[in-house]
């Protein structure tokens, strides 16, 4: 059961196809944690070139998936509602396993620090029971230009 579907996700963050890397939110505790899902399919545009005959989800797009989940967590906090979360830093990123078409990527994010217009989160992505990626992400929250939504 999902807490937020794709339409509801797009009401919170500005990302759209082909750069929206989240299908739904499974769990959400505003200001604390979020778990979201990305179903990785062979139809993803990036598989055309990464790599033909050996499709692998680029690690930077796993980080982007985690960043999008983190943005929702941050923007569901009362003080940041209606704003945009911009990725400011990536620390300690580690990639532990290849992600391929057919994998279900579970995106886990936990808020570790929130101060003024900044937030720091610990993230990791799982496929089944295997951790495929982890990173600490820092966000800066700013105004949103609503005319493009």
Swiss-Prot record:
Lineage top rank: taxon: Bacteria
GO CC term (a single one): membrane
GO biological process, alphabetically ordered: fatty acid biosynthetic process; lipid A biosynthetic process
Pfam families: FabA
GO terms, molecular function: (3R)-hydroxyacyl-[acyl-carrier-protein] dehydratase activity
Catalytic residue positions: 50
Coarse class of the protein's main subcellular location: cytoplasm
Reaction equation(s) it catalyzes: a (3R)-hydroxyacyl-[ACP] = a (2E)-enoyl-[ACP] + H2O
Localization, UniProt: Cytoplasm
UniProt entry keywords in alphabetical sequence: Cytoplasm, Lipid A biosynthesis, Lipid biosynthesis, Lipid metabolism, Lyase
InterPro entries: FabA_FabZ, FabZ, HotDog_dom_sf
Protein role: Involved in unsaturated fatty acids biosynthesis. Catalyzes the dehydration of short chain beta-hydroxyacyl-ACPs and long chain saturated and unsaturated beta-hydroxyacyl-ACPs.
Family named by the database record: Belongs to the thioester dehydratase family. FabZ subfamily.
HAMAP family listed in its UniProt record: FabZ
Protein name in UniProt: 3-hydroxyacyl-[acyl-carrier-protein] dehydratase FabZ
């Amino acid at each position: 059961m999902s807490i937020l579907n794709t339409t509801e996700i797009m009401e919170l963050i500005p990302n759209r196809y082909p750069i929206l890397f989240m299908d739904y939110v499974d769990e959400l505790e505003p200001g604390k944690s979020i778990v979201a899902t990305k179903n990785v399919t062979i139809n993803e545009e990036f598989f055309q070139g990464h790599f033909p005959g050996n499709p692998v989800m680029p690690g930077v797009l796993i980080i982007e998936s985690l960043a999008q989940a983190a943005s929702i967590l941050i923007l569901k906090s009362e003080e940041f509602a209606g704003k945009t979360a911009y990725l400011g830093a990536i620390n300690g990123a580690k990639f532990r396993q290849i992600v391929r078409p057919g994998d279900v990527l579970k995106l886990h994010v936990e808020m570790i620090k929130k101060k003024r217009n900044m937030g720091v989160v610990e993230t990791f992505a799982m496929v089944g029971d295997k951790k495929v990626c982890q990173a600490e992400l820092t966000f800066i929250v700013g105004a949103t230009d609503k005319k493009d939504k």
